[in-house]
Amino acid sequence: MQNTKAYEPGDFIVKQGEASQGFCILKSGTLEVVKGSKVITELDVPGTIFGEMSDILGEPRVSDVRAKDEALVMHIEKSIDDLIVQDPGIAKKLIYTIAKRLEQTTSMLEHL
């Protein structure tokens, strides 16, 4: 099941520690990924997938995601495994998303 929801600045899309209910796709706006009181990164590219790691690993959310400005987010309330079987193209998008995050993390670690 999927639904699209509008968020106002400061609204939380996902909360750290929550059980995964699927994953999300940013349709418009800017989101902040927050750990504690620190903003880790911003998401502002339409089509960006987030929240997928908790779904893949079956673990609680590791950070908060909140709207920095008005944002539109699609919630996919279906397991990624089931979705990949129905739409194999989503697997390529997920692999790309995870690879880009790994690249960014590696780059950040190199500069420490």
Task: Show the residue positions of the predicted features.
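A short hydrophobic/aromatic micro-motif that marks alpha-helical segments and, especially, helix-coil
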Residues: V33, K92, L102-E103
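Cyclic-nucleotide recognition modules
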Residues: F12, E42-I95
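Polybasic "coupling" helices that flank or enter modular domains
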Residues: Q2, Y96-L112
